[in-house]
Amino acid sequence: MDLIRNFSIIAHIDHGKSTLADRIIQLCGGLSDREMEAQVLDSMDIERERGITIKAQTAALNYKAKDGKIYNINLIDTPGHVDFSYEVSRSLSACEGALLVVDASQGVEAQTVANCYMALGLGVEVVPVLNKIDLPQADPERAKKEIEDVIGIDASEAVTCSAKTGLGVADVIEEMIARVPPPTGNAEDPLQALIIDSWFDNYVGVVMLVRIVNGTLKPKDKITLMANGSSHLVEHVGVFSPKSVDRPELSAGQVGFVIAGIKELKAAKVGDTVTHSPGQQGRVPASEPLPGFKEVKPQVFAGLYPVESSEYDQLRESLEKLQLNDAALLYEPEVSQALGFGFRCGFLGLLHMEIVQERLERQYGMNLITTAPTVVYQVEQSSGSIISVDNPSKMPEASKINTILEPIVTVNLYMPQEYVGSIITLCVGKRGIQMDMNYLGRQVKLTYELPMAEIVLDFFDKMKSISRGYASMDYEFKEYRPADVVKVDILINGERVDALSVIVHRSNSQSRGREVVAKMRDIIPRQMFDVAIQAAIGSNIVARENVKALRKNVLAKCYGGDISRKRKLLEKQKEGKKRMKQVGNVEIPQEAFLAILQVED
């Protein structure tokens, strides 16, 4: 046990944690040079392209330290993005230590801080590492000071390295071995294993990545998953040295995989506890699960519809397959008058939503229409009952509503001093309430309470463009508060198009209605009859635009001649147009739904 070290790497996006992981694997000889490739642990093509880590991965490596002993080190790679913070907390609770990787040229950023506090809260030993010191603009002294100011851990001893060139990586491992304690736990106790991650493999079913806290696990053992009580027979256990290697047993302190012929991922939830089933000789089930398991609740909802209605079944299958790998994704079928059959999907945040959409389009070749993302509102009806509304079309009539509560989140923003003014303006424009403001070296930390609905649309993009990409943020849910929000409906020729409805704050509902209507006028193609586009709040029309009809010049064949002849032709045309307008329906192009997402303030 004394020679085992479990650690993960915490870093902001692009501070080089995947590259550092590659170097550590290379140094320990986990893969031969031929098998080595950049970002070995990021196995999804989207992960590679965007340079982000989404799913947690592991590598069990052997390292011969300077003191001559061979250490068994388990590296657990974690995502850095705030949307995936649950995955991070699971990975961290499986470790005794974490390397805090900070880019020496950029200093500390928001998500590093969020994940680092999470690590300190879980009692994990944090070892600061300064990366990218080969860059000419690297300033390690300033970065050390920032770590001390912002996070409050001693960084005077921080190891410097360059993951790209491999400089100083051995020192990082030595420091980690010296400072991180070995795992506690007893191989003789009843089995308790934490599921860090689980994914679906087409050949063997669900693969669970577990950290054995107490006890031992061997093939042919019967195991029980404590959250839902289902039992399964273990077929294989082993470790990843990034490649999977079968082992005869996994014992306390180790991290490895378990394959037990589980058919669906919903059974093996991340954060659940695995133990032995009762009634086996010499195997005692654990009396209680490990702490910290919670169901992940989606924060952002959007409708996904296939462009071709015939692809509905295919979309359902793709979502099922995707859910096998992404337990945080929720979906349920819904019907829209404008878009036909589709699904209402729940996501952890905006990045998660983009990635799900991209994976559906890329891995499963779907063509999708996405409706505007919304958050969950709590509506207290006049009858006294409270309902949750995650879809504008489910919002009851205004007369039946007492109060509407909207989710408020606490947002921490970090940015260089020169951008503070413009970021504050942005937050105030989004109905933010400033809670706190700290100067930390050259960085500023702003804390705001903002309605989640304002963040969902375009807050992130705006924040990045105002600050030229230097500002970073993380948010967490605080509470529900009463809010004066209204539903804006878009009517086309007097008919409501449910997929275009949005819920917005009353103060900017009129302007929002006007903008959407103006945008729709440019997008909806001209028909043979006039098309009226209106924005309505309840029964009040707040904006209207017309798309003029295309018309044939019916007088072309009359040269000169009597006015009554011309009038007859014009009247006849007018009658025809009127009749068309009664029966005609307007095709709403795909862009119209996207336009709603990009309405500028």
Curated annotation (Swiss-Prot):
Main subcellular localisation: membrane
Domain tr-type G: from-to ranges: 2-184
Subcellular location: Cell inner membrane
Keywords: Cell inner membrane, Cell membrane, GTP-binding, Hydrolase, Membrane, Nucleotide-binding, Protein biosynthesis
A Pfam short name: GTP_EFTU
Chain residues that bind GTP: 14-19, 131-134
GO biological process, one term: positive regulation of translation
UniProt-listed Gene3D superfamilies: 3.30.70.240, Elongation factor 4, C-terminal domain (3.30.70.2570), Elongation Factor G (Translational Gtpase), domain 3 (3.30.70.870), P-loop containing nucleotide triphosphate hydrolases (3.40.50.300), Translation factors (2.40.30.10)
TM region(s), chain numbering: none
GO MF entries: GTP binding; GTPase activity; guanosine tetraphosphate binding; ribosome binding; translation elongation factor activity
Job description of the protein: Required for accurate and efficient protein synthesis under certain stress conditions. May act as a fidelity factor of the translation reaction, by catalyzing a one-codon backward translocation of tRNAs on improperly translocated ribosomes. Back-translocation proceeds from a post-translocation (POST) complex to a pre-translocation (PRE) complex, thus giving elongation factor G a second chance to translocate the tRNAs correctly. Binds to ribosomes in a GTP-dependent manner.
Protein name as annotated: Elongation factor 4
Organism annotation: Polynucleobacter necessarius subsp. necessarius (strain STIR1)
